[in-house]
A protein has these predicted regions:
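Fe-S ferredoxin-like electron-transfer domains
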Residues: 83-118, 124-170, 226-327, 461-476, ...
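Small-residue-enriched alpha-helical segments and adjacent helix-cap loops
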Residues: 20, 24-109, 166-214, 220, ...
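Hydrophobic alpha-helical positions that pack around
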Residues: 278, 282, 410-532
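Short amphipathic, charge-patterned alpha-helical segments
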Residues: 385-387, 532-548, 797-803
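Terminal amphipathic helices with adjacent charged low-complexity linkers/tails
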Residues: 234, 269, 397-411, 415-417, ...
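Accessory "access/gating" subregions that flank catalytic or transport cores
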Residues: 311-351, 503-504, 509, 517, ...
Length: 978
């Protein structure tokens, strides 16, 4: 039996099959899903439920070509929303659709393409375009159509490898996704074409990315005794570079080169020779040998010490490998910073004959691209770390969970894994070992390790309760070691150089280097690797080159959506896990986005809230309903009109509730950026209370004006994609307020700075962070509940000790912790935990009925009321609605919303009133998969799937109605409600 067949029981085929269907049909067709359900022997409703969870899937046909506009953080601050609207306008897409009338293009937004330094990035099919603006969308479409035409006409030339390949001069070019977006693919092809035309004796070599994408396309000419670097190379430069360094006897080529030099604006002898980029002299560990090796060449990797660490690992005991990792003090690079050596020790000591290693490459942060570049440019280093992990813990299967959007990284890894398999290196690992790729389907929450496991097992990516942790009970209940891409890439370096060498870099508590995706309003964006402990100012100024021309840096956003913002005044702080956390941010996976004075902090906070609102798994009420409501409150700051008193306090209080009451890390960190911005830029938030946006970003609060300094140069008219400026030559311009989209492009191109935002500047004032202190656990085998000590008994929940209000909990089974009405305060964790599901922990101190607990329950009930239509007069549950009993008991109140409530659905056996459903999911638990949750976040609904509600027989109808705590489900043959 082949290794792949040995592991079929671990990886569910549902998600891979759905991805294959989407590729084939460009959408998920009903008949294809029905056939898939029959073939996999799973309920059709489960197929629809899973498919609706992941954003990569669509149920309506799309155009022949798909345009994906990146709206990640770096692209957003560069105007991605305006680029998206420009594509729609250029292609005449109707307001209620996303496909052009000719069916050629479908335009959509994507959370991140991982090309942040080339913002705004746009992907059309497999081609990526960088630095797209509203005024260039037409050219992008034309260029793409020309590429398609050329690809269809081109035939590949399979030249024989030269026996003297290693002695040949080399022209090295990176073709990673970012550099391709800058045109390196075309430059690569141009050098190949010149080589063939002139019969030159050089080799065009694809190499790993140098990380300096602002210099791309970067070309290095490697001769016997020298290296020459050319940056920002264009196609018309190629022949001159070749003529500069190589000679040929081909008279035709020489005459063409002579004519080029004679007529060209850039003659071959005058081309600027770039100095070796200073970034290459910086300390590099995981990006070592950048720009030198062919990423897919196993020989290149071995020539520079590749797999020496793996060979050494084969001579060491697992305990010795773990010891070396502990000595290095490597911490996980995925965000949490958990000690890697300790995690490997736990996996090694976990009982079980069968174990799994998973590389979490689901880089979902909008603004991060480190993992993509590492996988595309240093795939063998990442894989070597994974193989060492498998050897250490005794795993027979390794899985790389990677985003489907990273098409080039997927292709590179597929080819590299195949080469490793052919090399026989897997034979040194446990019997039957295999390494496989698993493609994710677009869900940020699947970056959370337990949600990722659910996805591999063919379910919706909803985080599991912890403990147990994956290292003890992970994939299919097996011990599972999970680290991210950069963490695995560090392992070979540690084993070769020794843990002490790695430990010597960094600070006393954080060691080694960290790769960052530097992007946004900075001169030199790209992948950088810096020693941990460097200051933010050093990163922005030395690596990033400072602010863009005529701008000043305002702040950096670090840690992705779950991180925070650090203002310019605090750029002297050091970048390490502890310092960032103390300043309201976090290391995260390594996204670092620079913003300048033209960016609005309220708008930035709102952007991240909108992202997280759509990415919530939808399980717990504080994340599912709390984040959208917080989003509504922050959005009201950007609207013109009177603001309710105490609005900023309400925003902060709700944000704290969400932090303390969400089940998983996504919800608990969702308000971080809002709280951080509110803390560091309080004056800017107060300006919005007065209907002013100092940055000029919020449309309703901004009205650009042209001053008398205008000289009538018309540059603003040429740059305005909305056509909102009128001007006669040499006369003052006039902005049409009703047409202006407040993108600010006119202001940035005006040479006289004559376009201004009349909002007055506000002095910034810091507001102290309000943090809940954590309480130390008590000694002994006890727990403390409401001040009284009780003996600690493993496996118990708070329901075993106290009477709590419950809505979603069922003694007969089913999933709980959706409503959080049963929440209790855990003083040791410093947050609320579900009393129905959370196992009590030794030494912890709990509150079940304090004022803070009652206030939290009131907030949870109020958020659930958002979905309620309040048509209670005719409700069958009137007078015996447990939900409204709690609403009255805790004094919950309905929050204003603009929801459109569905009309009740009536069948022969039941009535379903969606306007009263609170998504407790009790009905799902007893329906035998005839009901399921479809979609996610605040779009989640209970549905029978493609089958109508009429498909529920009387027995099932009675079951689901009997457990409904509201009037959402009513049995027509007598009320079975308890």
């Amino acid at each position: 039996m082949t290794p792949a067949l040995l592991h079929l029981d671990l990886i569910d085929p549902l998600l891979p099959e759905l991805i294959a269907l989407q590729r084939r049909d460009r959408c998920l067709l009903p008949e294809a899903l029905s056939e898939l359900a029959d073939r996999l022997h799973v309920p059709l409703n489960r197929v629809y439920s899973v498919a609706s969870f992941y954003q990569a899937f669509r149920f309506t046909p799309c155009g022949k070509h798909q345009i994906k506009v990146c709206v990640g953080a770096a692209c957003y601050v560069k105007g991605a929303e305006h680029v998206y609207e420009a594509f729609r306008k250029h292609l005449n897409i109707p307001e209620d659709g996303d496909t052009s009338p000719d069916g050629l293009f479908t335009v959509s937004k994507v959370a991140c393409l991982g090309c942040c330094m080339l913002a705004v990035a746009v992907q059309i099919d497999k081609h990526i375009f960088g630095h797209v603006t509203p005024s260039t969308v037409g050219r992008v479409v034309r260029d793409f159509l020309l590429m398609v035409r050329d690809e269809e006409a081109v035939t590949q030339d399979s030249a024989q490898a030269d026996a003297k390949e290693k002695q040949q001069p080399e022209i090295r070019i990176c073709r990673c996704s970012s550099c391709r977006a800058a045109g390196s693919g075309r430059i690569f092809d141009a050098f190949e074409e010149e080589r063939r035309a002139g019969k030159f004796d050089y080799k065009v070599k694809e190499v790993g990315c140098h990380g300096m994408s602002y210099r791309a396309p970067l070309v290095t000419v490697m001769l016997e005794n020298a290296a020459y670097h050319y940056d920002n190379v264009q196609e018309y430069d190629v022949r001159g570079i070749v003529a500069q360094h190589f000679s040929t006897k081909e008279l035709t080529w020489k005459s063409r080169a002579f004519l080029d030099a004679f007529y060209s604006r850039r003659p071959q002898g005058c081309m600027k020779l770039a100095e070796p980029p200073p970034e290459l002299d910086k300390l590099r560990l995981v990006t070592k040998n950048s720009g030198m090796d062919d990423p897919e060449s196993l020989d290149d990797y071995r020539a520079h010490g590749g797999f020496a660490a793996f060979d050494r690992a084969l001579t060491m005991t697992p305990a010795q490998i773990v010891y070396e990792l502990k000595r290095s003090k490597l911490r996980g690079r995925g965000g949490g910073g958990f000690p890697t050596g300790e995690k490997w020790r736990m996996a090694l000591e976990a009982p079980g004959d069968r174990k799994v290693v998973i590389c979490n490459a689901d880089e979902g942060d909008p603004g991060a691209f480190m993992d993509r570049m590492l996988m595309e440019s240093y795939p063998y280093r990442v894989l070597e770390g994974i193989l060492i992990a498998a050897r250490t813990v005794g795993a027979s299967l390794a899985i790389i969970y990677i985003r489907e959007e990273y098409s080039q990284a997927v292709s590179v890894l597929e080819r590299v894994i195949a080469k490793l398999r052919e090399s026989g290196i897997f034979g040194s690992l446990p019997p039957g070992f295999d390494l496989v790729l698993f493609r994710g389907a677009g869900a940020f929450v699947c970056g959370e390790e337990t949600a990722l496991l659910e996805s591999i097992e063919g379910r919706r990516g909803i985080p599991r309760k912890r403990p147990p942790f994956p290292v003890n009970s992970g994939l299919r209940g097996l011990p599972t070691l999970m680290n991210n891409v950069e963490t695995f890439a560090c392992v070979p370096i540690i084993l070769v150089d020794g843990g002490e060498v790695f430990n010597a870099v960094g600070t006393d508590e954080s060691h080694g280097t960290k790769a960052f995706a530097l992007a946004g309003k900075v001169r030199h964006g790209g992948l950088i690797e810096v020693p941990i402990g460097i200051t933010i100012d050093e990163i922005v100024e030395q690596y990033g080159g400072g602010a863009e021309k005529n701008h000043t840096v305002k702040a950096v956003m670090i840690g992705g959506p779950s991180g925070g913002c650090i203002p310019r005044s605090h750029f002297d702080i050091r970048v390490d896990y502890q310092t960032l956390q103390k300043n309201g941010a976090m290391m995260g996976s390594g996204g670092l986005i620079v913003i300048d004075e033209s960016d609005c902090m309220v708008d930035i906070a709102l952007y991240f809230l909108r992202f997280l609102r759509s990415e919530s798994c939808g399980k717990c009420v504080m994340c599912r309903e709390g984040v959208p409501h917080l989003c509504t409150l922050v959005e009201s700051l950007t609207r013109k009109g009177p603001k309710p008193p105490g609005l900023l306090d309400r925003i902060e209080n709700l944000a704290r509730m969400i932090q303390q009451g969400s089940l998983c890390a996504l919800g608990r960190t969702a308000p971080n950026m809002v709280l951080s911005a509110l803390h560091e830029f309080h004056g800017e938030f107060e300006a919005h209370l007065d209907n002013e946006c100092p940055a000029g970003k919020c449309m309703e609060l901004t009205d650009f004006r042209v001053t008398d300094d205008c000289i009538g140069c018309t540059k603003c008219i040429q740059a305005c994609a909305a056509g909102a400026i009128e001007c006669e030559p040499l006369d003052s311009a006039r902005i049409l307020s009703e047409t202006c989209v407040r993108c600010g492009v006119c202001r940035s191109v005006c040479p006289e700075h004559a376009i201004v935002n009349p909002c007055r500047e506000r002095p910034e004032q810091e507001v102290p962070f309000r943090e809940e202190p954590h309480t130390a656990p008590v000694d002994g085998d006890v727990i403390v509940i409401d001040g009284t000590k009780h003996p600690f008994v493993s496996g118990k929940t708070m329901l075993d000790y106290a009477i709590l209000p419950t809505l979603c909990y069922m003694e007969c089974g089913g999933t709980g912790a959706h409503c959080m009405v049963c929440a209790v305060w855990d003083a040791v964790l410093g947050r609320f935990v579900p009393g129905c599901e959370q196992l009590l922990q030794r030494g912890h101190i709990y509150e079940t009925s304090s004022d803070r607990v009652r206030a939290f329950r009131k907030e949870a009930l109020s958020l659930m009321l958002v979905r309620h239509d309040f048509r209670c007069g005719s409700c069958a549950a009137k007078g015996k609605c447990r939900f409204f009993d709690y609403v009255r008991e805790y004094g919950a109140h309905k929050t204003k919303n603009e929801l459109t409530y569905p009309e009740p659905v009536e069948t022969p056996h039941l009535v379903f009133d969606g306007g009263k459903c609170i998504l407790c999911q009790r009905c799902v638990g007893v329906s035998g998969e005839k009901l399921a949750v479809h979609n996610r976040a605040d779009r989640a609904v209970i549905s029978p799937g493609p089958d109508a509600w009429e498909s529920l027989d009387a027995t099932t109808a009675e079951k689901v109605c009997s457990v409904c705590p509201t009037g959402a489900l009513t049995f027509k043959h007598g009320d079975a409600r308890p």
